[in-house]
Amino acid sequence: MKRKLLLVGRMRYSLPLSPSLAQKFDALSEELDVHVLASDAGGSGEDARFRLVRGVRPRVLDGPSFYALLPFRVAREIRELRPDAVLAQGAQEAALANLGRRLARVPTCVIADIHGDPAAPTRLYGSSLRKALAPCADWLAKRGLRGADGVRTISAYTSGVVRGAGVEPTATFAAFMDLEPFLETRPRPLPQPPVALFVGVLERYKAVDVLAAAWRLAAPQVPDATLHLVGRGSLRDVAGQLVAELPEQTRWTEVLPTPDVARALDEATVLVLPSRSEGLGRVVVEAFCRGRGVVASRVGGIPDIVEDGTTGLLVAPGDATALAGALVRALSERGLTERLGASARVAVEPWLAAPEEYARQIRDLVEKVCGTKPG
């Protein structure tokens, strides 16, 4: 009989699932009896595996409401489903899931699923008002990691974060990434004139402000080059101002479907990712699939993927001058970017895991944790 697993997190899902998410959950369902407690992103479909929570208005209350009620919702799901394990995406979520387990008074394992630095969301994401929540979030994260029956990490960096809290990871393996749209065709030659591409949310943790400052320094040195920004977020004014100042050398697209992101990478010389915090950097793997090198900050999980001078150029986080210098090199030295791109395409091979392999790793994690937890 399959183990029963409850996935818990703030992730937003729309039903019916997209083809890539359908692959992931269908593979998981082959190995485990999977159920999901998460947020509703809209949609008119139905899937018995999903219990999605609708948002509340005003939007500023949506997050606090979700987390305040999460222990009670987890407790309800545990009582109804009797899962063998709860996989909580995030350290704070693991603490709240552990509280839900106590409320339910049902024996089940709680596994913390760590994809980044638990301290980052209240310091670098969204509104500055989040900073006031940092002490509470830090306390919750520590309780979540230390109270979990197991911890899964996705990289050497996230493993280091967990060990810093005095906890040894139970397993380390990458998140499932549907890379098929980025592998359907062979990488295209680098474009001419050169283009630097940024893909991500326009938030402080992605350091869009640093990128804007760097581009003001770099643009005059590479007058035929363009910076293409893809994303939206609370720092949209930073992007808008940059386009207004350098309209001939800056483009901004708020939303691109996944196939169009692949095309944007083909039309780019290099990807730029100047983050202040980054768990892994999925877009780096996508860029590697398209044979593109990366200019990025030496922070978080980025150095776990990008080898400085081989598959990309790494600079100190927050250093606009160093970032500008790296961009000028990448956009003016075609031989360098061709070499970085060729090495990147080779380096991506270990990341090309099928959904079935990911599902088996999750199953093995659940078996390992449930098998070692005292009854």
Feature annotation, model-predicted:
Residues 1-43, 374:
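N-terminal subdomain of nucleotide-sugar transferases
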Residues 6, 152, 188-206, 212-216, ...:
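Conserved donor-binding/catalytic core segment of Leloir-type glycosyltransferases
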Residues 24-26, 72-76, 118, 131-151:
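Membrane-proximal helix-turn-helix segments that form the acceptor-binding/catalytic region
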Residues 240-259:
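Nucleotide-activated donor-binding/catalytic signature segment of Leloir-type glycosyltransferases, i.e.
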Residues 293-296:
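Short hydrophobic beta-strand element within catalytic cores of glycosyltransferases
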Residues 308-309, 313-320, 329-335:
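Conserved acidic donor-binding segment of nucleotide-sugar-dependent glycosyltransferases
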Residues 335-366:
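A charged, aromatic-enriched C-terminal amphipathic alpha-helix characteristic of glycosyltransferases
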